[in-house]
């Protein structure tokens, strides 16, 4: 369960809870029977799934929900996106803070965001960097993790 859930949790800045770490339980003592080796594996969806922070519709309810759940929010232009250690590293060009949260003003100048475990999943918002974006996220340890990204549309008053 951990192996399938933890990567999705990390996209949003959460790690596997300490209380569920396997080494706290006696080995072989599980309440759910293990799947026999000859059982057929559940079919997995075909194709590459979109990074969860990128898989959202531009609806005001979704934006407000992300904003409330995030520690920080910025309007920004993106200079570049790189792959680094299995993550997508997002380097801002210009940024305007909307909600600073844990970001200190002096850190804002050198701010770099990470899409945790996002190196190989598509994020269509990042295909064209000429737009402004609404970026939301949270700080985990010393990294600022992107938890939602929306194209900033000046014309859409919603």
From Swiss-Prot:
InterPro entries in alphabetical order: Frizzled/SFRP, Frizzled_dom, Frizzled_dom_sf, Netrin_domain, Netrin_module_non-TIMP, TIMP-like_OB-fold
Gene3D superfamilies in the cross-refs: 2.40.50.120, Frizzled cysteine-rich domain
Protein keywords: Developmental protein, Differentiation, Disulfide bond, Glycoprotein, Secreted, Wnt signaling pathway
GO cellular component, one term: extracellular space
Main subcellular localisation: secreted
Pfam families recorded: NTR
Subcellular location: Secreted
Single biological process term from Gene Ontology: negative regulation of ossification
All copies of domain NTR, residue ranges: 51-158
Positions of glycan attachment: 38
GO molecular-function term, one example from the UniProt record: identical protein binding
PANTHER family to which the protein is assigned, alphabetical: FRIZZLED, SECRETED FRIZZLED-RELATED PROTEIN 1
Function: Soluble frizzled-related proteins (sFRPS) function as modulators of Wnt signaling through direct interaction with Wnts. They have a role in regulating cell growth and differentiation in specific cell types. SFRP1 decreases intracellular beta-catenin levels. Has antiproliferative effects on vascular cells, in vitro and in vivo, and can induce, in vivo, an angiogenic response. In vascular cell cycle, delays the G1 phase and entry into the S phase. In kidney development, inhibits tubule formation and bud growth in metanephroi. Inhibits WNT1/WNT4-mediated TCF-dependent transcription.
Name of the featured protein: Secreted frizzled-related protein 1
The organism of origin for this protein: Rattus norvegicus
Upper lineage: Eukaryota, Metazoa, Chordata, Craniata, Vertebrata
Recorded name of the encoding gene: Sfrp1
């Amino acid at each position: 369960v951990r192996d399938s859930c933890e990567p999705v949790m990390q996209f949003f800045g959460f790690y596997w809870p300490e209380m569920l770490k396997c080494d706290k339980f006696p080995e072989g003592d599980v309440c759910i029977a293990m799947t026999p080796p000859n059982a057929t594996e559940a079919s997995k969806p075909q194709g590459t799934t979109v990074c969860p922070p990128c898989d959202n519709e531009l609806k005001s309810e979704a934006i407000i929900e992300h904003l409330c759940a995030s520690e920080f929010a910025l309007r920004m232009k993106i200079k570049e996106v790189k792959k680094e250690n299995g993550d997508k590293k997002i380097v801002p060009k210009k940024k305007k803070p909307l909600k600073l949260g844990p970001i200190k003003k002096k850190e804002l100048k050198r701010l770099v965001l990470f899409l945790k475990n996002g190196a190989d999943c598509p994020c269509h918002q990042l295909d064209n960097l000429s737009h402004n974006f609404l970026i939301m996220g949270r700080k985990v340890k010393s990294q600022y993790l992107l938890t939602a990204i929306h194209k900033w549309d000046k014309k859409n008053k919603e």
